[in-house]
Amino acid sequence: MSPEELKQLELLRNRFAQLTSNLGSLRTSVSNSNPLPTYESLQASVNILQANIRSIQDIATENAGLFQRLAIHPSTNFPGRTQEHILTQLLRKKLEPNVESWVEEARATARGVGVDASKLAGGVHRRGEHDYDDEGTYGMDEDGDDAPQDPFSEQWADMLDNFQQTLQQYVTVQVKKKYTAEERAAGIENVRTGLRQTLEESEDDDEDEEEEEEDEEEDEAAAAAGNAGGLATGAGGSAAAGGGMFGAIEPEHIFYLQAQGNLQLPGNVPIESKRIQTVPTRRVAPPR
């Protein structure tokens, strides 16, 4: 091996060690934290792991030829007796049973959707062999028919179209409905919403309710303006005479008008000027 090839192998080893350390740190954080880590913390850990995996993939892609022709042989000073399990793991030529089952399941899934599984066993792609160039433009080449195609490209395109159609259907139709299709099939009168008011599905009723709310807001605004005008013009006459609907205007009326836009005080609001003043009784001093 040349020094440059040894450097690439050492770089890949460091990346795997860093990935293992980050996975162990995340596992410890989730297991020992009470409460669990925040969403932002978990997302940051996931981003770090994705960056590590992407770095390993880039190194493996660039040095695919080197890693395919390398043969591992333990040195004479390796402690094979005490570290036999590590040596067996490093020299293993076949996949582990659980990994082998995952691979077979993935191949069966690929065959089920019409993908040739033999195309998926071609090893790691070299840079430039995909249907996108080094500038990151994907599927923009004019002579894309001559380039080798990703066997999953059609499946990803179908999933993207299906997702976009489902999302458009949900945003334009389903999100405006108050009941699901299952609830409508079973009868909306049997739906337990936890609300006391009657919910109807008619769009005309929704428009009528919006118009009624707008009318009520206009009436309240007009009433508030009329009350404010009556306060400005009749405070000197009606209030001074002690007559009128509200009688004398008290500070409580002003505060309630400012807060609610109405001079009609509720019955439970006390008026300070009408509170009965109790004179404290004086205790007579005993004779000396």
From Swiss-Prot:
Q: Where in the cell is it found?
A: Nucleus
Kindly list any coiled-coil regions of this protein: 4-58, 180-228
A single Gene Ontology MF term assigned here is: transcription coregulator activity
Segments of this protein annotated with the region Disordered: 122-150, 191-245, 266-288
- Tell me the InterPro entries matching this sequence: Mediatior_Med8_fun/met
Per the UniProt entry, what are the Gene Ontology biological process annotations, in alphabetical order?
Answer: regulation of transcription by RNA polymerase II
Q: What is this protein called?
A: Mediator of RNA polymerase II transcription subunit 8
